[in-house]
């Protein structure tokens, strides 16, 4: 397939708008899909030590599932609920490779955070006793936040579009990652604008006792498909 286009940053509004239009076609089923994935993530998160790594890996399959049903909604106006698990039936190996990369990034992030905290606040025993200087705690916290942000941005740049490209275009992992990176690097303005809008929507969704997230979360899960369509086909 062709390489991604460079588009105006203002197209980010179209990506959010396209996701909203898709959501309105079958809101109930999409909310149900998001709730199911949420329950799965909560269950995985309760597994000691490896829960976070499994969440990072499975999220790729969730994004692929939403990309697939987004295409079904766009073309047919509906989807079968079981199609949210399409990634476990098709292109499973390729998605698993991307998921494994996500798990490794999560592991590196966690280990680096521990090293930063221990290195800046002293030995573990003093940390356990909370015998810490306020400035040290703040410095450690800011360092961890900065590291997590950098790793998150880099990982997202390489993988944001990869699940859609794998499940919809049968792209191999290496090329899917390359195309995702090209899409990001050629549309940094749009990526930043889109991220800010998604963050704002998430915050707004939290206001009414988190009930707004029932709408916001499944809608945001459709955004990667909207970006994929705009960058590669318009």
Locations of regions flagged by a protein language model:
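Hydrophobic alpha-helical membrane segments
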Residues: 1-234
């Amino acid at each position: 397939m062709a390489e991604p286009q460079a588009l105006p940053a203002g197209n980010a509004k179209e990506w959010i708008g396209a996701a909203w239009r898709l959501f309105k076609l079958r809101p109930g089923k999409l909310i149900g899909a998001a709730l199911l994935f949420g329950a799965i993530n909560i269950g995985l998160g309760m597994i000691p030590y490896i829960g976070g790594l499994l969440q990072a890996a499975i999220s790729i399959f969730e994004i692929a599932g939403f990309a697939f049903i987004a295409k079904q909604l766009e073309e047919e106006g509906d989807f079968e609920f079981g199609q949210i698990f399409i990634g476990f039936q098709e292109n499973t190996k390729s998605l698993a490779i991307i998921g494994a990369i996500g798990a490794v990034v999560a592991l590196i992030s966690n280990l680096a955070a521990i090293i930063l905290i221990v290195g800046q606040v002293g030995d573990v025993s003093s940390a356990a006793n909370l015998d810490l200087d306020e400035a040290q705690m703040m410095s450690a916290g800011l360092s961890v936040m900065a590291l997590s942000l950098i790793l998150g941005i880099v990982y997202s740049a390489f993988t944001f579009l990869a699940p859609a490209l794998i499940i919809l275009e049968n792209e191999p992992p290496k090329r899917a990652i390359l195309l995702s990176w090209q899409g990001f690097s050629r549309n940094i303005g749009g990526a930043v604008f889109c991220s800010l809008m998604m963050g704002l929507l998430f915050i707004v969704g939290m206001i009414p006792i988190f009930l707004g997230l029932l709408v916001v979360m499944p809608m945001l899960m459709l955004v990667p498909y909207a970006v994929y369509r705009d960058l590669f086909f318009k």
